[in-house]
Amino acid sequence: GGCYQSCEPHTLKCGSVSFEAKCKSGWSCYPVTDNIASNACDRFKSCQDRWATVKETDAPCTSCVPGFQLTSRGYCSQDLNECNRNNGGCTNGKCINTEGSYHCDCDRGYLATSSRTKCEGVECEPLTLANGKVQSNKGSWIFGSRALFTCDDQARSVLDGPSYITCNLDAAGLTASWSGTSPTCQNDDEHDRFAEVFHLRFHGKKLDGVSLVTGLSPRSTAYRCHKDSTCQGIMTRAEEFEVSATGLTVYDGGVLTKTLGQSRADGDALTDDASMDIYTKVDVSSAAASSYQDVLDAMVGTSLGCYTTSSMASWEDYTLDDGRATTCNQICLQAGYDYFGIQASDKCWCGQKPPVEKVGDGECSTVCVNQANILCGSATTANIYQVYRDRSLGFCYTGNLGTETVPSAKTKDECVTVCRGQGYYTANIRNSGECFCDNSLPGGPRVDPTKCDEDGSGHSTVYMTNPAYFMSNDQGAQINPMTTRMYDDTGSVTGMTTGLFQRLPGLRIFTSDRLVLYSAEEVQFHDVQNDYADTCGEIKRIDGESDRSGDLILHFFHFRLSQLAKHTSDRASRVYIYAQKVVIDCDIQVQFSLMIRATKIVVSTGKVFKILVGSESSQIEMDVDDVKNNGPPRNLQQMKDSLQCARMLAQSWDDTEKQKLAFNILHEMTSPTAGNEAQRSVQTMASALKLQLEGMFKNDIHHVPSYSAAYFTYLMKADSDIVNAYAARLNALEVITTSRDDFLNYTQELEKIHQDTSIAQAKKRFDETMKLYKKEDLVYTKLQAAYDTALTNLRGVIPTFRKSIEAQEDHLRFKALLSFLELGVAAMDPAAVASVSKGFYDDVTDIAASSIWGIDQVVTNIDSFTDVMTNNLNEMMSEVKPYDGTKYAYEIEKVANMHVFVEEWRNFQVEVNNILGDDTVSALGGAGDYGRNLVKLTNIGMALTNAMINRAEKTRDAAQKRTTWDLLVEQGRRTTEVIKGFKAANSERAAANSVVAEQIRDITSEINGDLANFCEAYFFEKLEPCPKSTQPRFGGDLLSVQLSISRAEREAASLGLDGSPVSREVTITNTDASEDCIDVTQCPVTVFKRDRAFSYEVPIDNFDLSDWDKYRVKEIEVKAIGATPDRTETDLKLFVRSSGSFSGKSGGTHYNFLTDDFFCVYEYDINSPIDAPPESASGRCTVYARGSKKDMTRYATPYAAWMIEVD
């Protein structure tokens, strides 16, 4: 208050305020007088008044009211900007200065205190552990912290469950919850010292059936170790741990069902097994105790010396109960730290960097309570050690030994040192003395470590060289020869050299907590130049999609990192890039954390050498362990964009490379399973498309869709109306800068368009698809009934056929035939088989293997598929419950196999005709009826199988459209909520902008999907790609998409108008032949009246797609020469069907196409000269006609295979 005139402490009372008067630094002292005291009181009062004048006799003011500071004239009227110093103390937030005060605007995951001058992190609920302790690696339960669990009695208890769980933020950043449930402490009566050392030394903290098998405590007598697991190395070092291999106990499905002692007591034989070794303890007496202690002490990293704990403010501390440095090492290792320290044997410290205040070793002379060879600090100091990590691997491999030979290095340590110095990541020791350096794990499988001890074996033991990284690869019997993952488990790495990609060409993921690069495919390293062609176009980020904490999300299909500066700002703290392909084409040095998730990453040689992020940048909020296994988190919008791109690429029938790219995109999308419902819905659609592509690749089948020109004309018009409606409102929003009401009005209009137009359009698409589904379902149902009738009729004539067979002298031979025809060769009577001649038996066996089994399989699949599809239809028709696409995805895979069974039907029909054509068989009574019924069953079965395929395809299409509809409904709900918040002033304009942008993005994506469907139909109609102006524009705005729609609308009107010049004629002759004829082309019409049918194949050799129009069928005519009425009726019907499958090639590529079934009926009175001339009865079916009302692609194939039936 200006009262600085006294040398002695002196209390002055100014009104109701008391303060101490003392001398200010740099001022002289003189005795205190009442006058001085009075002046001091006056000056104190004036310093509390912002506008009080300063008298010349007044002592200078030294302080003002909080929030203000002195001007040069002595006034307290100048605002004090608290934010200029240490951000106002707003750690984890931004300081906002106001006149005379300030407040904190907190980052995501932090909430302001009641005074608004601090930001406190969102925390999870505290945890407890019965018979154990729970400690946080951050000293609190703030989000991102880990709860570390330990049991009190570590000598006789073990954790059953995770050793730690993580506190995770919710999507809004307002609450937090634990990633899992707490474990329990389970008692274990058996304990020995070897068990403890074994468990710690060989990463036994995770008892999950991989390193050690769950079900047996790590501190019990017998231990199990899979030979393909991390603990395999102990087999070569058993003596070091004073254990011996004793064989295998009873083993059942990965669970040890008996202890070693029980097996011995029961007299079980202990046999060798390739998958497991059992180790038991040996006597760890006092004589062996020193060896045990040496091993335990070796599990502590290098000592850095003694440091004061006062210089360790940034370190985390934990309670240490057992007084062992080994335990502290394990705590800090699990928490992800590089260094640990022990204070007075009871406190464990963990940190990322060494402390700064080092003292003499004499200040840390106290030894650990239970580890006498290790120093454990004092009351005010701590011994600091590097965290011990067993990075040596020590695994024995076959295969590549390395790219660099080091003759001078003979030992492991020498080899590792040399290889590290030369920049390699692995050191390989062969024959216990030859050193090789490399940057990847060997190409061969891992083998028994004892093989590496054999001179001349050619095997090598592999060690890691760089303590900052840990390499991992795909596990399995055959190790992937290339490294697939490299991660920094210390969290300290903030950059990398791109030379890493060159040395590790198979690298797919690099992970630290500030820099994450992920590629679903192997990273490519070459001079890319223009190797980033926009397969699907460029998808830019959604405008407004960034929050106030500085997180920025960018969406691209193809992105060059040299353009990163255009899309970021100084405000960014974390940048997330989601793309199909990322080109690293320049050095990158940024101050924000960077995460890239792409299907492919390409590094340009000679243009880029390093990627660095700021060491003080914010850590990326993610579970690093999950990233190591599954890659960075997904983004919903990128998943929807990726699916749309894959759909377009999958429809590139003339480009198999694009289809393979589509498959890779879908594979990356579908594995592993996404975390939330919306992402899983998109993932389900991707799974179905992936299965469809798998079927195409496996069976070389391309299903031709069914669309009409009228449908596309309507669809393009509707899409155009939607674009116009959205564009008008968006243009208005762009010019609104101040009026909140105007912004709200236009935003609400966009919401209404979304509800009335976009969602309505999505529902209409679904309804139209359901109409096609119902049409296919009706055909399927009729054919299914006909199939059941045909099967019943076939079984009805079997008794007559049986009696004729049994009446023959050689009845055993015919009994074998009968059992084969009924059930296949597996059911043939053994006695009958024995009496059959070898030649006949061989014929029957061959037919059974290729045909009868196939028919059984077809019938089985049809029966099961009917139930599945019926249930799916019922769910899809629900207007309330969203359709769960996971229920049909697996069945789509079956559809791919159904194409094969169409051919099985045909083969079966031919082979059965061969059997029935045997003179002896055809002479039997009832053989003709049996043959005719069997042939009809095969014809209907073929048509039924095709109908099932068609219906399944319609199911997939309907399910996709239903899922899209559901997603739009959900998006509309979120949009409504955001607008409500904006209306109530609970949310900012940026949030409304973001959700509107997302809405526009989805609509544009759907319209692009319509364009992709149009281009697919165009290809099958014109046999050439659709015009570029009609192709989807994935990176375009609404207006650019509008241009494509307009052109597609014009092109759609011209589709389906060209007729075909090709006609087919099928003639039935020789109508005077016997009624019991076998050759289907030699039978009279009266035979066909008894449900006889036959197949007709259009002869096509080396069909080329360029000859499409030569084989596209305009009409097919069936003639029955000399047809006459029978005794009962004169009506005659001709049924003509085709499977719609054909093969062809284009540019050397072979295609198999499948369209919808063609079916027509021609009916007339055989006595009428108008309907049928006397010399023949004929029916003519129009297959492909001129006119836009016909389905443009329904009859686009030549229909090479026909089934004709006369009734």
Curated annotation (Swiss-Prot):
Keywords linked to the UniProt accession: Calcium, Calcium channel impairing toxin, Disulfide bond, EGF-like domain, Glycoprotein, Ion channel impairing toxin, Neurotoxin, Presynaptic neurotoxin, Repeat, Secreted, Sushi, Toxin, Voltage-gated calcium channel impairing toxin
Residue ranges of domain Sushi in the record: 122-187
Cystines in this chain: C83-C95, C90-C104, C106-C119, C124-C167, C151-C185
Principal localisation: secreted
Top-rank lineage group of the source organism: Eukaryota
Tissue specificity as recorded in UniProt: Expressed exclusively in the four pharyngeal lobes and in tissue located at the base of the teeth. No distinct expression is visible in the putative venom glands or elsewhere in the pharynx.
Quaternary data: Dimer; probably disulfide-linked. Interacts with Cav2.2/CACNA1B calcium channel.
Protein name: Glycerotoxin paralog 1
Species in which this protein is naturally found: Glycera tridactyla (Glycerine worm)
Organism taxonomic ancestry: Eukaryota, Metazoa, Spiralia, Lophotrochozoa, Annelida
